[in-house]
Every structure is written in C-alpha cells, then in structure tokens.
Amino acid sequence: MATKKAGSRLETEIERCRSECQWERIPELVKQLSAKLIANDDMAELLLGESKLEQYLKEHPLRQGASPRGPKPQLTEVRKHLTAALDRGNLKSEFLQESNLIMAKLNYVEGDYKEALNIYARVGLDDLPLTAVPPYRLRVIAEAYATKGLCLEKLPISSSTSNLHVDREQDVITCYEKAGDIALLYLQEIERVILSNIQNRSPKPGPAPHDQELGFFLETGLQRAHVLYFKNGNLTRGVGRFRELLRAVETRTTQNLRMTIARQLAEILLRGMCEQSYWNPLEDPPCQSPLDDPLRKGANTKTYTLTRRARVYSGENIFCPQENTEEALLLLLISESMANRDAVLSRIPEHKSDRLISLQSASVVYDLLTIALGRRGQYEMLSECLERAMKFAFEEFHLWYQFALSLMAAGKSARAVKVLKECIRLKPDDATIPLLAAKLCMGSLHWLEEAEKFAKTVVDVGEKTSEFKAKGYLALGLTYSLQATDASLRGMQEVLQRKALLAFQRAHSLSPTDHQAAFYLALQLAISRQIPEALGYVRQALQLQGDDANSLHLLALLLSAQKHYHDALNIIDMALSEYPENFILLFSKVKLQSLCRGPDEALLTCKHMLQIWKSCYNLTNPSDSGRGSSLLDRTIADRRQLNTITLPDFSDPETGSVHATSVAASRVEQALSEVASSLQSSAPKQGPLHPWMTLAQIWLHAAEVYIGIGKPAEATACTQEAANLFPMSHNVLYMRGQIAELRGSMDEARRWYEEALAISPTHVKSMQRLALILHQLGRYSLAEKILRDAVQVNSTAHEVWNGLGEVLQAQGNDAAATECFLTALELEASSPAVPFTIIPRVL
C-alpha cells in the first residue's frame, strides 16, 4: 500500500516537472520510479527520451530558418529511448501517442521532415483530445502542431498548381494557429496550477515557482501565423490574429510576447490602415478589404474549431476602440506600461545586453506614441509619456530630444529649454539644437540673455557650414534687436541696434538666398528709420519669397512711412488675398483705411474681422450680430484649430514682438482681469488666451476708429466689449482715458491713464496722453519727467518729442524745445501708419 502511495506521489511530481519543463529533475525521479514500480520501464524510456531531447534543445536552441542538425550522439541516445518505449508497446495509448509526438519532434530536429509528417498522420493529430488532460500534454500537442507547420513549410510541393500552393499555405497557417491557441491554453492552465499549488502549500517552505519559458516551438506557434498572413498579403487576417492573441487572458510567460504583438499591431494600424478600412475588434472582419492582396482570395474567418480554447477577457464594461488611432494608442499605452515595469536600468557590464534590449524596446514604443499622439495634437499627453521614458534616457540623445520637442509642442517652453541643454551636452556638434533653444528663449519666455548665449553657440558650431552660421547670426541679430526694444536707456538702445544690424548683415552675406536674412535686415533698418535702405532689402526678400506675409507687411509699412498710404493699402490687400485670416495684417489695414479711405471702410474691416474670428473659432450661431456679450455666451475655442491660424502674440496692439515689460504687464493684466471677472461674475473664457486677446484687440481698434470720428457712445460700447474679456488690460484703460478726453472729462481721463501706467509703466501712449493733461493743468515739471521717460522707452515716437517740445516751450526753454520739435518733424516724416515693431521678430 505504501509502495502504491509512493508511486502515486512520484507520478504526480513527474507530471508537475513535465508541465513546468523542469527537465533536469526528470532522470532522478525516473530512478526512484523504476526502483519502486518495476512495470514502469517503458514509461522511464519515454521520460528519459523526452528529458534528454529537451535538455539538448535547451543547450542548442533552434533558430527559424536554420539548417537541420542531423544525427548527433545526444540525439541518437534520445532515439534509442523513444524506440524502446514504442517497440515494446506496453504503454497506455495516451503515452504511446506522446512517444510518437516526441519522436516526430526528434525527426524534425534531425531534418527528417517527411517521417515527422508520417508520424503525425498515423497518430491522428487533429483527433487528440484537449479536455481532461494534464497541462504538459497540451504543451506536447501545441508543439506538435507547430512542428507540423514547420515541416510543411520545409517540404517542396510536388505539383506547381497554384491551388495546391494556396491549400498548402492555408494548411501551414492553420497548424500554426492551432499551435498558438493550444499554447495559450497550456500557459493559462500551468499558471493556474502553479498558483493553486502555492496557495495550498503548507507553511513549510517548498521549491520556488519555476519561470516558464516558451521555447522555440511554442514561440513559433504563437508568432508565425500572422507573419505568414502579412507575407501573403492578407492584412485583415493578420490583424485579426493579433487581436485574438491579445484578447487571451495574460500569463507571466506571455507578457513579453504581448508587448511585442501590441507594438507590432499598433505600427500596422498607424502605418498601414486608414480610418475607412478599419473595423473594431468586436466586429466581424470585412469579406473584402482594400488592405488585402486582390489576387489572393480566401475567407477572413477561422477554418477550424477546437474542443477547448484559451480564456479571453470579457465583461460588460470592457473598452472597445472605434478607430485605428484610438486602438493604436491603447495598445501603445499598454506596451509602455509593460516596458516601464520590466525596464533594465542597471549600468553594470553584465546587464549591458539586457539594458540595450530594454532601451530599444521602449524607444520603439515611444516613437510610435509620438506618431499616434502627434496625429491628434495631444502634445501634453505625449510630453507626460516621454517624461516617464526618462528612466531609460541616461546618455540617450534620441529620448532627450523627443522629450524636448514634445515639451515645445505642448507649450512648456521653460522645461523644453532645460531639456535642450542636456541635448546640447550629448550632441555638441549639432547646430539645430541650440538654434531651437534660442527660438524658444526669444519667444514667449523672453529670456534674451539665454537666447544670446544659444545664438553664439550656433555661430561657433556652424563654423563648418555657412548655412548654420548664417542662422546663428540671424538668431543673434534678433536677440540684439529685442534687447534694444527692451533697453530703458536711449544710448544702450542705439548700441544694441547697431549690433543687431551688423549681425543681420553678416547673416545676409553668408546666406544671400535666405529670404529671412534679407527680411530681418530690412526690418532692423526700418526700426532704425533708414527707410530707403530697408526698401531695397525688403524687395530682395520678396524676390526670394514672393508670398511671405511678413515681407509684404513690412513693404506696406515702409510705403506708409513715405506717406504712400494708397500703395501701402494695396500691398496689404494683396497679402490678405493669400492670408485672409492674418489678424496682424488686418489691424494694419484698419489704420491705413482710417488714414486714406475714411472711418466707414475701417469699421467695415473691423466687422469683417469679427466674422473671421467667429468662423475661426466655431460660433454655434454664425448669423449672430457680433455684439460682444453674445459672442462670449456662444464661443467655443477649438484647440486644434488654434494652431493653424495666424494670431498676434502680444498684449499691446502697437507691438508684435514680446517685450520684457509687456510680458510682465500681460501677467499682471491677466491676474487682475481674472479677479475682476470673478467679482463681476462675467462669463469664463474657454481655451487658450490668444483668441480672446485677438477679439479684445478687434474691439479696441473699432473703438479707436469711433474716437477718431468723435463718437464717444459707440467707442464706449466697443471698449466695454474688450473690458468684458480683459477688464484690467492697460489697453482697455488707455482707451477709456481717450473716451473721457473726447467727452472733455480731463480728471477722469487722467485717472484712467494713471491706472493703465500702474499696470504697464512703459506704455508710451498712456505716458504721452497723461503728460498732455498735466501740461494743460500747468504741472510742467511732472509732465516733462513723464515725457523724458517715454523718450527713453521709445526714442522714435514723434508725438512724445512734440509733447516734450511743448512742455519745454511752456517752461521758457526755447532752445531745447526747438530741438525737440525738429526731432519730432524728422521722425514724423519717416513714421509708418503702424509701428514697425508690430511685425513679429521670431526665428
């Protein structure tokens, strides 16, 4: 009785070791079994043959497409064991079947494919049961199907008939699909058994659970079917097979395989499938698909059934993607979480190979995520994903650079610059990286000292190529030009303007065919009021790029500086025919129309701008009259559309480039406006600020036109619309001061100008109007102080010089007053309708 119990325990242990592929333990267990049960000699031969074959394959792994091994001493020994077990015929039928399947596997390893197929035919592989069998037998059957598929692929077809070729291909794929399905079932079963054993184990510690390995045959069964589908041009079935594998309940052994398959399917969905040819995972595949090779016809559904299948994920609340990008994104986010979980980060030499594989796998996932999220404009999410990739990014330029670009696209400029610094360290010879950093610094960040350093780096790196050196000088010129605009001392402004001019001249000489170099040289000359020279260079820029909006705009402003207002307006109209939604051009058009065609046309343009603004940002009621309150109630700013529209990036309508003072002022305005809005319970602004700033500017331009024709009521209504958006904007407060002046209420006007200057202390127009009121009140010293400060801020404002002359004259300083009047006359003669600085200075 004790012997029977011992035998039963041994048999259970042997079955467990076979299921868990612990082949090194089998010989010792067989010895114990033979000593206790003499009748098990044939079983011992089977077990020894199987364990020695598996040990050989572990030591000499097979590779797809490798040549056959032929007879080897170890394999000869395997054959002896299996032949002995089969020849005596004492085994039960199921063990005889196992012996035959293992013998067929041995024949494949030795290259005897025909004999292997003969054995499968004799055994009746398709009739072997899958229910009520131990897990190891599922593995044996799965490997048998995979081996049969491999043998069929290796053997040539006797006839050249195309139908036979198609039938053979389908037989091969069916073998692999069955192998894969049964392999998944086996892996689920063995994991269930292992977990059950762990839970039922007594407190006494036992052997640690053995990590399963797929091995060559199971891996082939799981991966070969979809490869053949794609090779044969049947993308529909290939995608279907991927989905079947991914829907199966995951096991520890299939985790890496699932990550690979998820990544491959995502790549196919992104690169090889459009929205029209997509079908979701719960739908039946289309009978005919443009994805498939039209010359190869076949069913897009399974041609076989199995008596038992692997468990799949199911339930009421499972998410099902509805389009290809959505499914790809889901797959990639799953892959990313798996890549992060299994990351190999150790820097010790022994782990180098594993670390490189881990990095390569993660990099592919993040590259595909960049494609998927980039298509949808989800740069915020992309930057968050790539931030998680930083654990892999030590000394890896590609991931750092991708992260920097995603931060740029997401509008996180400050962080992007810091990441770009690391990219420069990793790749110091690449001039494009400091050029990008300079672009960010001179943009919304307005870090001009940093921008100057990056621009000088570009110049130094670009010594080998004149193209990058020219770009470096262009960036340097823009930095100096912006610094000159910021400078509070007139002498410093002139020094920086000269440096900017020299840098632009150097850029133009290095790259005479670059329209940007010619354009910015012309713009800098215009800012310095060298109008004839500027005209020459802007014409060069237009010869190089005839449809450049900024060059056309500059030409129009230069013509207006020469008082050719009609010609300037014609140029603006020409530019607007190419760029009808460019608001900066439209603002200039309003000013020019006021000067040469009268206020009616200018007001029509303002109305037209409101209509464009509505159409750009999806008004739900396009027939709306355009009143500001109703605009606020019904406007929806679509983030995707904002990137395709030209919007002014400024808070002051007189300047298109960002200034240090205007950056600070706009932040103060925004904070105060939010407080004021909350107190007034006005409608909240949806989406980014730029569209709302543009809308406010439209209303302010309309108000300015009404002030010009002496209509304070209409001007007040327009200003109120802007105030609904930004109650504490210095431009709104300035316009209220203008309206108060028009009504003759000087004390009120003075209060508005003082409030505007409290928010933006360098707003020249408010300074000039406040000084004029102080002059009228007889406060000459304070008026002079304010006007001298205004001259320091903007030395080309002729109205300020004229006001300063009047104040000095009133104080009896006629000589200084005369000099101021002459300066004002000289500047007015070259003054454009709109300041040249309205044109953005960006890379």
From Swiss-Prot:
Localisation: Cytoplasm, Cytosol; Cell membrane
GO terms under cellular component: cytosol; plasma membrane
Disulfide bonds: none
InterPro entries: Endocytosis_PI4K-reg_protein, TPR-like_helical_dom_sf, TPR_rpt, TTC7_N
Origin: domain of life: Eukaryota
Membrane-spanning parts: none
Any single biological process term in GO: phosphatidylinositol phosphate biosynthetic process
Alphabetical keyword list: Cell membrane, Cytoplasm, Membrane, Phosphoprotein, Repeat, TPR repeat
TPR repeats: 97-131, 219-252, 363-396, 397-430, 479-514, 516-548, 549-582, 696-729, 730-763, 765-797, 798-831
Principal subcellular localization: cytoplasm
Phosphoserine PTM positions: 160, 202, 625, 629-630, 673, 677-678, 681
Role: Component of a complex required to localize phosphatidylinositol 4-kinase (PI4K) to the plasma membrane. The complex acts as a regulator of phosphatidylinositol 4-phosphate (PtdIns(4)P) synthesis. In the complex, plays a central role in bridging PI4KA to EFR3B and HYCC1, via direct interactions.
Oligomer and partners: Component of a phosphatidylinositol 4-kinase (PI4K) complex, composed of PI4KA, EFR3 (EFR3A or EFR3B), TTC7 (TTC7A or TTC7B) and HYCC (HYCC1 or HYCC2). Interacts with PI4KA, interaction is direct. Interacts with EFR3 (EFR3A or EFR3B), interaction is direct. Interacts with HYCC (HYCC1 or HYCC2), interaction is direct. Association with the PI4K complex is strongly reduced by TMEM150A.
Protein name as it appears in the record: Tetratricopeptide repeat protein 7B
Species: Homo sapiens (Human)
Gene responsible for this protein: TTC7B
